[in-house]
């Protein structure tokens, strides 16, 4: 995992991993980094989706992120964005990372084949703007990757994934990066 390498090499002192602001809890990242005090894992997800937390089956068990927020099935834009904003802004202020790694999963979208949240295209776009603007305005570098998203129509999926790139471009222009 690249975040561990960055910490071990001294490239950063503290790293925030927004591994999951999508429909699934970031259990794998939480497990890998659970003993690493210099890393903070944040997950805002649908509480009734994989991984389901079956104890006794380690490969399906939930590992706790440093901050886990499980949302109800069917959560829409307003509640989702409010949760993301509160958690992200609070964590940026309290943990004060040198770098944010953000996995911009789009399986929160209302038309996603496997998601259980109901986030509109506008809500998805606002999430990307919120995450990137929050980091850039605090002068915290952010690295974004696309992830999560299930649709039989590749064009629809690509359109959703493009939201994070549009938000990054807008921040680049706004802040003259």
Model-derived features: positions:
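Conserved alpha-helical scaffold segments that buttress catalytic/binding sites
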Residues: 1-133, 137, 162-166
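Metal-dependent de-N-acetylase/amidase catalytic core
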Residues: 123-177
């Amino acid at each position: 995992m690249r975040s561990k390498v960055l910490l071990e090499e001294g490239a950063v002192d503290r790293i925030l991993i927004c591994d999951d602001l999508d429909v699934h809890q970031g259990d794998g990242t939480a497990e890998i980094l659970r003993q690493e005090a210099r890393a903070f894992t944040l997950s805002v997800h649908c509480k009734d989706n994989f991984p389901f937390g079956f104890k006794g089956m380690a490969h399906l068990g939930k590992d706790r992120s440093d901050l886990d927020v499980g949302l109800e099935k069917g959560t829409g834009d307003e509640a989702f964005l409010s949760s993301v904003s509160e958690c992200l802004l609070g964590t940026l202020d309290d943990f004060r990372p040198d770098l944010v790694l953000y996995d911009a999963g789009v399986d929160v979208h209302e038309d996603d084949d496997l998601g259980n949240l109901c986030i509109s295209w506008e809500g998805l776009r606002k999430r990307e703007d919120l995450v990137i603007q929050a980091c850039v305005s605090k002068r915290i570098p952010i690295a974004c990757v696309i992830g999560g998203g299930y649709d039989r129509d590749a064009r629809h999926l690509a359109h959703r994934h493009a939201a994070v790139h549009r938000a990054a471009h807008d921040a680049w222009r706004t802040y003259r990066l």
